[in-house]
Structure formats: structure tokens, C-alpha cells
Amino acid sequence: MNIEALNNFKQSGEKITCLTAYDASFASVFDVCGIDIILIGDSLGNVIQGGENTLNVSMDDMVYHTKAVTKGAQNALRISDMPYQSYTNSEQALTNAKLLIIAGAQMVKFEGGCEHEASFKIFQNNDIPVCGHLGLQPQSVIEMGGYKTEGRDKQSADKIIKDALALASWGVKVIVLECIPANLAKQVSQSLSIPTIGIGAGVNCDGQILVSYDMLGIHVGYVPKFVKNFLIDSGDIKSAVNAFIEAVKDKSFPGEQHSY
């Protein structure tokens, strides 16, 4: 899988599938099943390390897990998250992004919009592929007042649209849209020539991502609205992954019950 193929998917209308992975074993299963993208996510702070948020994930953590996933996945496009405070300025961002690329990432992802213009541009100038992340931004959960849907009011929605257009103009290859109204995600997706990957953003994004642990029902307590357990009706993990891929490709997931 490569960036050109993702762009072709957008043009043809075929949906892009994405799951998180943190180790070689899960990555190899997802890869064999034909997942399009594997995100080595800083969500490992929640599901691997047991934290309440992603803020304590370090660059060393991300490099370690990127190396592990790379050993298991050779076909899917590998995207690695840049963790909290790893891109506070453009030079720091470039240094840390290069560490993830050396570890095996083919693209790096970081949260935020126009406030990171310098980092987006320095990546573009250094030919480092970038995935953006707009809407709910887990690394800013404290500043944003908790985990909640973004883009419900006009000011917030306008900012998401403005940021998305700016990111595309600065060479960003893909944008994740998290927890925004489905109609806003549709508007953003239709306004861009690059693919969007939704999580809690409705069926009209160009692709869908879930945290793999959520997709497999490995959670206790609160479960976000956008999550579906694909293992519960499947016999094993491979079958669950195949069911997720099929549901995304045929647009039966996410349904209205998973959208805002």
C-alpha cells in the first residue's frame, strides 16, 4: 500500500481501512487480512500502558512500537503517531519524525491545525509524508475540556474546514477526522483532494479507523458511541478483522448509531 493507492481509492470511491497495532503479532494478522493502513497509535498509552490519556507516551515508546509493528507488517501502509510534546517547534518535530521513519514508519501523524504551520512546512520541504488529525484531539483533551464531539457550532466547524484546507495545501497526504458531526465530515471530505479517515465522523469519510482493542471488544467501562465490537459475532481475530474490512468497504460501518 502506498500514498498513490490511497488517492486512487478516494477517486474511485473505494473505502480505506485502518486499524491500530502496537506489536508484530497483531500487525501480521492485520496485514495478512489485507488492512490498508496500520496506525502505530499513541493510544498505546491507554490500551497498553493503562493510562487515562495519551499524554505520558514518549518518543522512545513510539520508536519501540513502530519497530515492532514494522517486523509484522510489510504490505499495509505504516503510520506512526508523534506523541505529546514531540513537535512543540518545527526543528524538534523534524528530528523526532526522522526517528520514526528510521524505525519503520512510512508516514507520521500529529494533531492540530494552522498553529503547527511551521512543522507541516518543514516536513513538506524534507519529503516526510504527514497525516493530519483534526476534530477531537486526544493530546489536547485537557485544554479542550475532555473527550467530546467537536465541530458542533459554526465557529468550531469553520476552524476544522479552514485547518483541513490549510493542511492539504501544505502537503499533508491524509487527514484523520475524529468525533465530528457526520455532515461536517462529509463537507470536509468533499472539499479535499486528499483522503480523510474517520473515527466517529460518519460514513462519508474516505476511510475508517478504529483502535484494534475496541474493534475486538477488549475494553471495560465506558465505550465510545463510534465503537463496534466485530469479534462478538466472529469466531476468531482474523474473522473479526475481515468483518471490519468488509463492513467499511461496503459502507455498512459506521452506521447512524455510530455517528454524531
From Swiss-Prot:
GO terms for biological process: pantothenate biosynthetic process. Its EC number is 2.1.2.11. Its cofactor is Mg(2+). Gene3D superfamilies: Phosphoenolpyruvate-binding domains (3.20.20.60). 3-methyl-2-oxobutanoate binds at residues 42-43, 81, 109. InterPro entries: Pantoate_hydroxy_MeTrfase, Pyrv/PenolPyrv_kinase-like_dom, Pyrv_kinase-like_dom_sf. Pathway: Cofactor biosynthesis; (R)-pantothenate biosynthesis; (R)-pantoate from 3-methyl-2-oxobutanoate: step 1/2. GO terms for molecular function: 3-methyl-2-oxobutanoate hydroxymethyltransferase activity; magnesium ion binding. It is found in: Cytoplasm. Homodecamer; pentamer of dimers. Catalyzes the reversible reaction in which hydroxymethyl group from 5,10-methylenetetrahydrofolate is transferred onto alpha-ketoisovalerate to form ketopantoate. This is 3-methyl-2-oxobutanoate hydroxymethyltransferase. It comes from Ruthia magnifica subsp. Calyptogena magnifica. The gene is panB.
